[in-house]
Structures are given as structure tokens and as C-alpha cells.
């Protein structure tokens, strides 16, 4: 089972999905344009975290609504939910019957997830360049401008106009890879879908 800080790192990576879901091959300008225009996206994901000692794979679904609303639900091999309601990030571990809540600004304020609430973050926080193609997927490399960002780079891959994959390499050499499916770049989402109330009987912790 992943620790909370790893979950937030994954959230940080995936927040970029809003910016790239309709980018075309070699079109960093199109990526920027979509970042300015996109308001929401939903779909499914498979996440793999590779470290020197082990590899972990998880599956789930996600939805994002700008500004600043997101929900990530892990369904296999464990059940966890991450909800950002604009003020608070809620991490609900179903198996542990435990909820951890954190200030949204503190949890993701310095990470790529800031793009969720600030459309200028893409260009202000990253240096973007085309990064070639592999297995029919075209990549854009996003390098953080801050030296203490905690990760080396993010690679954003798209195929046939659709978001296909993302990769993040952290400062310790661990790599998180995500593949996407069932994307909807114009989902009918309401703000109410991102409200979270801790279930009765669970422990609630504050960071």
C-alpha cells in the first residue's frame, strides 16, 4: 500500500492531464492552448511505481474540474480515495478505516497539481519541449524550473489526439508511470461531486 506522500506525488503528476488531453504530435503550442481552454476531464488509469527495491501497480478512476477540484479513486489492489474540494485534500483509506485531511495549498501548492487551480502554472513552473516518439506515442518533456521541486521531469505522452501516458522521475530515481483509458474531455461534472464527508466510525487525522 502506498504512503500518503506517494499518493500526493501521483496526484501531482496526474493533475497535468487537464493540460494535455487533446494535444497533437509535436504541438507544444496546442498543449498550451488546451491548458488555457480545458475545464475538466475524467477517465481511468493504471499506475506503476518503480523503485530499486520493488514495483507497485494500482488501478482506478479520476475526475478533475477546474478550478481546483479533483477526485482519484484507487480500486485495485487496495481501495483509497483522494478528494480535493478547493480548500482541503481528503485521503480516505478504506481498508484502514482512516481519513487524513490536509490543507490543499500545503498538500499540492508547490507541486504540478497547482495547475489545477492556476492555468498560468504550466508555463510559469515548467520548461516544455518535444521529446520524440515511442511505440506510437508522442511525448512532451516538462522540466520543473525550481531546483527543489522533488522530481527531475514529467513526460506527457499522447496518441491520436488523446492522452495516453505520463511518466515522472523523482529526485531519488523512482519512476511513476501512468497509462490512461476511457477519457472524457468534456465531462458533465458538478462541484457537488467533489465534496467529501468522512464515513461514520473512521479515524480522522489532520496533517
From Swiss-Prot:
One BP term from GO: lipoprotein localization to outer membrane
Compartments reported by the entry: Periplasm
Signal peptide: 1-23
Alphabetized Pfam families for the sequence: LolA (PF03548)
GO cellular component: periplasmic space
Major localization class: periplasm
Swiss-Prot/TrEMBL keywords: Chaperone, Periplasm, Protein transport, Signal, Transport
Role played: Participates in the translocation of lipoproteins from the inner membrane to the outer membrane. Only forms a complex with a lipoprotein if the residue after the N-terminal Cys is not an aspartate (The Asp acts as a targeting signal to indicate that the lipoprotein should stay in the inner membrane).
Assembly with partners or alone: Monomer.
Recorded family membership: Belongs to the LolA family.
Protein name (database record): Outer-membrane lipoprotein carrier protein
Organism: Neisseria meningitidis serogroup B (strain ATCC BAA-335 / MC58)
Classification of source organism: Bacteria, Pseudomonadati, Pseudomonadota, Betaproteobacteria, Neisseriales
Amino acid at each position: 500500500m502506498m504512503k500518503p506522500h506517494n499518493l500526493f506525488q501521483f496526484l501531482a503528476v496526474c493533475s497535468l492531464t487537464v493540460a494535455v488531453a487533446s494535444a497533437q504530435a509535436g504541438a507544444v503550442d496546442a498543449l498550451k492552448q488546451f491548458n488555457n481552454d480545458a475545464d475538466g476531464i475524467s477517465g481511468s488509469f493504471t499506475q506503476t511505481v518503480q523503485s530499486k527495491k520493488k514495483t507497485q501497480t494500482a488501478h482506478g478512476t479520476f475526475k478533475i474540474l477546474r478550478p481546483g477540484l479533483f477526485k482519484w479513486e484507487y480500486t485495485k489492489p487496495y481501495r483509497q480515495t483522494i478528494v480535493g474540494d478547493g480548500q482541503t485534500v481528503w485521503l480516505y483509506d478504506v481498508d484502514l478505516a482512516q481519513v487524513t485531511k490536509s490543507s490543499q495549498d500545503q498538500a499540492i501548492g508547490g507541486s504540478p497539481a497547482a495547475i489545477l487551480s492556476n492555468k498560468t502554472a504550466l508555463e510559469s513552473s515548467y520548461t516544455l519541449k518535444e521529446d520524440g516518439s515511442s511505440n506510437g506515442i508522442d511525448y512532451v518533456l516538462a522540466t520543473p524550473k525550481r531546483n527543489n521541486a522533488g522530481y527531475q521531469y514529467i513526460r506527457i505522452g499522447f496518441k491520436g489526439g488523446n492522452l495516453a501516458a505520463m511518466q515522472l522521475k523523482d529526485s531519488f530515481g523512482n519512476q511513476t508511470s501512468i497509462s490512461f483509458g476511457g477519457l472524457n474531455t468534456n465531462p458533465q461534472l458538478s462541484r457537488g461531486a467533489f465534496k467529501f464527508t468522512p464515513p461514520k466510525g473512521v479515524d480522522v487525522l489532520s496533517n
